Amino acid sequence: MVKRPIHRLTGESVVPEIDELAEEVIITIVSKDEIIVRILATPTDLEDLAIGHIICEGRGDIESLDVDGHEIEIVGNLIPRPSDDILTAACGACTTGEIVIPSGIAESTQKLRANIGEMMREMKENQPLFNLTGGVHAASIFDEDGRIIVTREDIGRHNAFDKAIGACHSIGFSPKIIGLSGRVGWELVAKAIRSKIEIIIAVGAISSAAEMLARSAGLTLVGFATKQNPAIIGDLSRIIDKPSTSRKD
């Protein structure tokens, strides 16, 4: 988060003030003096970002890492991206030469026994950076009872996903259920497959490519999760939606 001068329109007047903006910088991941990837991201939880990105993109194994400013050096066996372009906050497979479909989930092992609406409300309450700036996405990992294990924020929804997966790896938790603050596209389902996520619950819509990949891989997607009637795609047996225990908005 950074503070910058702006002008605020208030009715018919213009008022100068200082506003809080979501920070966006280039994060460089290197290994053996070679650039693995450069990512436009929010410079928080960078260790989680690096670990999660390598896991979610299937780019090798990490033995150790060191964060120095906006550069992360990794020791391990890593595969560089085919391009040295910078991954922007809106980018998933932008610089990939071809779309490679990851192998699917072998079997359904997860049951969600919680109210989806309450889960999304709790996720929203765990977004301090969004509350300050209004300019970042969030990803939360839940257990089967709908309790939040970790929440991570970033200006890029792909980065928030990576950070949440990386945080789980660091604490030794095997993530199966993820909540997302935005829409679900193909690349987020691909990340879910690579990180062994079985259920994606999203505030936004589900794209056609995401739907096709999720069905072929055996994932369960929930779209428009904050609405009264969420849309569910895939294996319904994973969702046991409990009645809400709190007042509806």
What are these regions (language model features)?
Residues M1-A139, D143-E144, V150:
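Intrinsically disordered, low-complexity regions enriched in acidic/Ser/Thr/Pro/Gln residues
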Residues C91, K242-D249:
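Phosphate/diphosphate-binding glycine-rich loops and adjacent basic-rich segments that engage nucleotide
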Residues R157-I233, R238-S244:
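Feature captures the catalytic cores and cofactor-binding loops of soluble hydro-lyases/lyases
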